[in-house]
Amino acid sequence: MSCQSPIVVALDYPTMAQSIEMAKRLDPEQCRVKVGKELFTTAGPVILDELHKLGFEIFLDLKFHDIPNTVANAVCVAAKAGVWMVNVHASGGRRMMEASANALQKLPDNKTLLIAVTVLTSMDQSDLIEIGIDATPEQHVKRLAALAKSSGMDGVVCSAQESSMLSAELGKDFVLVTPGIRPAGSDQGDQKRIMTPVEAMAAGSHYLVMGRPITQANDPIAVLTQANADLGLMA
């Protein structure tokens, strides 16, 4: 049964054993899980198989950014591995994104969502200026998100602060995936643009990525259950 919750728990662990241990403390009916660079690099594709065996839908968060053919092949491999969602960097440009979208469309019965990363939530305007982009994060997100949609992406990763703007400009069916989500009162960590789950959904986000507030809690399933209850789910 497909997960009805918008919450995606980030399994940001250095070993497969730790990630599987945490996954076993969660409920695939209450969340999806995200596999990022550290975990995938140490564990390899086998981590996807193990999480699928536990019943989880997986967001493979590798942020591909390379020449069009390389990225197109990579997202196809991810889709064939059965991941629910995979992402690429919008800054890779139109040809890279179009090649990826077209490659997935050619796969029989493909259901993998293809999402573009806009501006990392750890970045602020000073970071953009340092890499030669004379724009606010909001302006650059808007530019990259529009490019992503016109290039065939299913949606983008963006901060909750940009969700309302993007939903209004690009349509409510354009999927918005929001990291930097933390329950009220949580430590901000290294995310500079954050919101609570309720605030993010109200702003137009479709999926909410949560990491340490759940994975470092004494009772992760209790925090997850409460977050879903706050959203009017599984109360």
UniProtKB/Swiss-Prot annotation:
Indicate the transmembrane segments per the record.
Answer: none
The EC number(s) attached to this protein equal 4.1.1.23
What metabolic or biological pathway is this protein involved in? Pyrimidine metabolism; UMP biosynthesis via de novo pathway; UMP from orotate: step 2/2
What keywords tag this UniProt record? Decarboxylase, Lyase, Pyrimidine biosynthesis
Q: Which domain of life is it from?
A: Bacteria
Keyword set includes Lyase: yes
Q: Which family does it belong to?
A: Belongs to the OMP decarboxylase family. Type 1 subfamily.
- Protein name as catalogued: Orotidine 5'-phosphate decarboxylase
Q: Which organism is it from?
A: Marinomonas sp. (strain MWYL1)
